[in-house]
A protein has these predicted regions:
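Short secondary-structure junctions
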Residues: 16, 592-595, 750-761, 805-810
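Proline-centered flexible-loop/turn and helix-kink motifs
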Residues: 153, 165, 593, 680, ...
Length: 821
């Protein structure tokens, strides 16, 4: 009796959600030692056996009679995912309706991703003459052969497509393959490789090297200089050796040939982030901070997971508590992850934490170059860095011995991914802490209503910092009624009160931050005579005027166009309506012509490193005014900022989302908290057309407890989280009637299946706020319920059915759990 062949269960990259499952593959004997859980492999998949990437989930043995395809090759020398991260990927699939490989893809840095590249190779038995003879008179086939021979007999498809420009080479390639002239295969190509540097070192003793240098002093002075430098430094990079001695590569190679030196390849890490060189003592904690630190740390025993909510007013010193917690974990030999909601916050956090932990810090966020992010990932995985700072995806950092995850500003919606997998970093952090028996700390001045409710119910441990550090006062806040400004003849976006306070700040050498949550210059360009407006041809939205680029832009699909000199319909005068950050900047430059102003929004920070550059300018050059979107509302700590202005509070409040009140309260509270963080008292001005709104009033007083008491009752009445979960099923297609037909079927099916459940309510179909994006109509069915296994199974089945049914051809259906919009 023969042993059953070894097999592996593999999550395949090419599998869509409706066919996704662990696929069984046979492990060839030659690969038996290399195929282990967590490594990526190349496997044939589908009817055409197309080669695709996959990741090994587990190993097993084949049942008798099973006919299995074999693994073609192994891509990784060691696992890229630990067993814990594999379990997390499977869990994300169940919770967020994605494929396992979607989750794996989110966990790995782009530098590790592979592309399957098609390659066309000249078949054996063909030379140049016989190949061209087989191609005959076809100009396209001859052009393909020109490229193949120019590439040495094997040419990637991407190069052929570039050669053909606007014409596809597919027909010519198919013909040459059919004639037996070319054969096609695929190969794996990684986006970025390990960075290596050539190092030169002696292979003899220093005494022997000096003797050799003396002998070469006259006949080979450059070789002599190289040997003397190597005696001093022991090892030096090839480029530095040549630079400091003036030697060429031939001189160094001559030493290698003589057996006096050797050249080796050393791996180096690409790192662009500047870190503090001086190590500082840990910050001194006040009584409140120490109580919070000791209370949270006491929950850690290494055998049980624990979650805490650290609620502290703006400026209360939550960051100092984080520093002490991370230091305590390092002393225990444990790794820590600190999550921040915005890339703009990472430079400040790096500056603070590197002053305490030096090179033990790694940074992960999307603005890093591909090679830099890959190298930071490697530093974490190999244990060279035990403190990780990053945005949402840093929750997947490959830390071994994880002891702590901190989510700063945990209420922020940016912790929820908008693309598959549509995970929330808080949920992923909970899973990782539960798997590693680690501490989870959620920190905020305005905690998420659901988090505060869980703390109230004892699910989270609650720790509170009620006072600003060093007994500093909260900013004094003034609400300006913009209706009165209009009645007084001021139709601009800046009230007279705010302009006066800006001038006062400038005269005192103090700085100001102005917050407006809309980029661009004008949200609407319209004709004053016929009413014509510029709208996107692909989306159901108006185009936004960007004065910097002098273009009209769609913020949904990216469509742009130039602005006409006059109305294209009637030739009338075009007017701009609405205010964005660019228009606000223009207005202030007119009102304050000699004052330097910085702007921080998605348009100004698009180049890599722009966040840090703008914030460094603001800090070091004491630029008087910083204008920005929500990037400037949280986490920034500038002691010289004594004035904050909220340009339009109403813009935050009235947006048709059940979380609008919470988001408005949080943003206003956070941005007001940027003021008065140093020795000087702070002020804040909130401009609004609805000063009587209770949310704006409570935000101005920084009354979180009052806001929470009202908001939690409203959520209870609306049956919104935390009293139920929300699952949305979104349907999109170019044909609106197909979307509505599919949505109606989904709604009716859910109602039928859940008829006996009192906790379930189905709403819709309803159009999304922007119903058409990129020529696709979008409608949604919303389900309020308890998100249990029955619901997950039902929704998953509907996704599979509707995405594969012939009657819904061209329709795309996806689901989301507790979306943020």
């Amino acid at each position: 009796m023969t042993d059953s062949p070894a097999t592996a269960k593999i999550a395949v990259a090419a599998a869509t959600y409706w066919v996704d499952r662990p696929f069984d593959y046979r492990i060839p004997p030659a690969l038996a030692d290399k195929v282990v859980p967590g490594v990526r492999v190349v496997v044939p998949f589908g009817g055409g056996n197309r080669r695709t990437e996959g990741i090994v989930l587990s190993l097993g043995t084949a049942q008798s009679g099973m006919r299995l395809k074999s693994i073609a090759s192994v891509l990784d020398a060691s696992p890229v995912l630990s067993p814990e991260m594999i379990r997390l990927a499977v869990w994300l699939r169940e919770r967020y309706f994605c494929t396992v490989y979607d989750a794996v893809h989110a966990m790995l840095p782009a530098g590790l991703w592979y592309q399957m590249e098609s390659v066309y190779t000249l078949c054996a038995g063909f030379d140049r003459e016989s190949a061209y003879a087989a191609a005959g008179k076809s100009a396209q086939e001859q052009l393909v052969l020109d490229a193949v021979f120019a590439h040495g007999g094997s040419c990637p498809l991407v190069d052929l497509e570039r050669l053909f420009e606007n014409v596809s080479p597919a027909r010519a390639l198919q013909s040459l393959v059919r004639k037996g002239v070319l054969e096609t295969d695929s190969r794996e190509k990684r986006r970025v490789g390990d960075k290596k540097i050539r190092m030169v070192s002696l292979t003899v003793s220093a005494e022997d090297a000096l003797l050799a240098a003396d002998r070469r002093e006259k006949r080979a002075p450059l070789q002599s200089a190289c040997l003397r430098l190597l005696c001093t430094l022991d090892r030096v990079s090839f480029s530095e050796l040549c630079y400091f001695t003036g030697a060429s590569s031939s001189s160094v190679n001559a030493l290698v040939k003589a057996g006096l030196a050797e050249i080796t390849q050393d791996e180096v890490f690409r790192r662009s982030v500047l870190r503090s060189e001086e190590q500082s003592p840990l910050p001194v904690l006040n009584e409140e901070q120490r109580a919070a630190f000791e209370g949270i740390l006491s929950l850690y025993d290494g055998e049980h997971a624990s979650a805490s909510l650290l609620y502290g007013v703006t400026g209360s010193g939550k960051t100092s508590v984080y520093v002490h917690l991370i230091d305590a974990m390092r002393r225990k030999g444990k790794a820590s992850i600190l999550l921040v909601p915005e890339i703009a916050l990472t430079p400040q956090m790096i500056r603070i934490f590197s002053s305490y932990f030096g090179d033990d810090i790694a940074v992960l966020h999307s603005s890093l170059a591909v090679g830099e992010r890959y190298d930071e990932w490697k530093r974490i995985k190999t244990g060279r860095a035990r403190v990780v700072i990053g945005t949402r995806s840093a929750v997947f950092a490959p830390c071994s011995d994880l002891g702590l995850i901190i989510m700063d500003e945990e209420q922020e919606y940016t912790y929820k991914s908008e693309n598959s997998p549509r995970y929330h970093a808080r949920d992923a952090a909970k899973f990782r802490c539960a798997s590693s028996n680690a501490l989870l700390v959620l920190g905020s001045a305005t905690p998420d209503v659901e988090s505060r409710y869980r703390a109230e119910k004892g699910v989270y441990h609650l720790f509170t910092l009620k006072n600003r550090f060093n007994a500093r006062q909260l900013p004094s806040v003034r609400i300006v009624d913009m209706r009165q400004e209009l009645r007084g003849g001021n139709g601009s976006e800046v009230s007279g009160v705010l302009l006066h306070e800006l001038r006062e700040n400038i005269s005192r050498g103090e700085q100001s931050i102005l917050f407006l949550n809309r980029r661009g210059a004008a949200s609407l360009v319209a004709c004053g005579e016929c009413g014509y407006t510029y709208s996107c041809p692909h989306c159901s939205v108006n185009l936004t005027w960007h004065s910097v680029t002098r273009r009209l832009v769609c913020h949904h699909c990216g469509y742009t166009r130039a602005l006409d000199d006059a109305c294209p319909e009637c030739g009338g005068l075009l007017n701009q309506f609405g205010t964005g950050t660019q228009k606000l900047e223009e207005h202030l430059r007119e009102a304050l012509p000699d004052v330097e102003i910085l702007r921080m929004d998605a348009d100004s920070v698009s180049p890599a490193g722009s966040h840090e550059k703008i914030l460094s300018q603001f800090r070091e050059k004491k630029v008087p005014i910083l204008i920005g979107t929500q990037m400037v509302t949280k986490g920034l700590d500038f002691e010289n900022v004594t004035l904050v202005g909220v340009i339009s509070a109403d813009q935050l409040l009235y947006c048709g989302d059940y979380r609008a009140g919470e988001r408005c309260f949080s943003l206003i509270t956070q941005v007001v908290g940027r003021s008065g963080r140093g020795a000087k008292p702070g002020r804040a001005i909130i401009q609004t057309f609805t000063p009587q709104n209770p949310v704006i009033g409570m935000a101005s007083r920084q009354d979180y407890e009052g806001f929470y008491a009202e908001e939690i009752e409203l959520r209870r009445l609306q049956n919104c989280p935390p009293f139920s979960d929300i699952v949305t099923v979104t349907v999109s297609a170019e044909d609106e009637s197909s979307v509505l037909r599919c949505c109606t079927y989904i709604r009716d099916r859910i109602r039928s299946e859940l008829r006996g459940r009192k906790d379930a309510a189905v709403l819709g179909p309803a159009p999304l706020p922007v119903v058409r994006v990129s020529n696709r109509y979008r409608y949604r069915v919303t389900l309020h319920c308890r998100f249990d296994k029955e619901i997950r199974t039902l929704v998953s089945g509907l996704l599979i059915q509707c995405n594969t049914a012939k009657e819904y051809k061209g329709v795309l259906v996806f689901a989301d759990y507790n979306p943020m919009e």
